[in-house]
């Protein structure tokens, strides 16, 4: 009697089992994984729209404002002193006060070299920082998608209604290793990506339309 009840359930034969060794399929949707994939796609889409260079520049500005930098402080001091020395040199006659003018000129030259050296150090630091941010963006977007595809390649995000789609479509949606009749992580990533693109396109179109309406109403001539 128990065997008859079990036969009414749905079964799958895992790889490596012999004939007759079946386990029931868990058709409960993987809600956590479903939301995680959707969040990763949304996050990647936001990063893509903002642009990596803009994010790098913004974070660099934040870091330089929050974290004290001796190089930035010294450059500012050198720049202020260079302006002061340049003004004094301009107001000093190179013929009547040559000694003073020459001293100011030497100091101004040293300050220019110092500022250039500091700029080179800051440029190198900025390049290293940009490389770190670029790597972090890659790992948290493309890298995360690759990890989800590999780690959960056999997971079923959710199950399709039985016999709702022909075999070729079910095969594509379960690619590469998810059970047939389910939606795999790879397929769900592509579905979410396409959906996000559509949502963003519609949103941008609506915003542009609203802005256009507001502008047209603003410039519309008043009738007497």
Curated annotation (Swiss-Prot):
Pfam families: CHD5
Primary subcellular site in the record, as a coarse category: endoplasmic reticulum
Keywords: Coiled coil, Endoplasmic reticulum, ER-Golgi transport, Golgi apparatus, Membrane, Transmembrane, Transmembrane helix, Transport
Cellular compartment(s): Endoplasmic reticulum membrane; Golgi apparatus membrane
Cytoplasmic side of membrane: 54-137, 200-224
GO biological process terms, semicolon-separated: tail-anchored membrane protein insertion into ER membrane; vesicle-mediated transport
A GO term from the CC aspect: GET complex
Domain of life: Eukaryota
Segments on the Lumenal side according to the record's topology features: 1-33, 159-182
Transmembrane segments: 34-53, 138-158, 183-199
Assembly description: Component of the Golgi to ER traffic (GET) complex, which is composed of GET1, GET2 and GET3. Within the complex, GET1 and GET2 form a heterotetramer which is stabilized by phosphatidylinositol binding and which binds to the GET3 homodimer.
Family: Belongs to the WRB/GET1 family.
Protein known as: Golgi to ER traffic protein 1
Gene coding for it: GET1
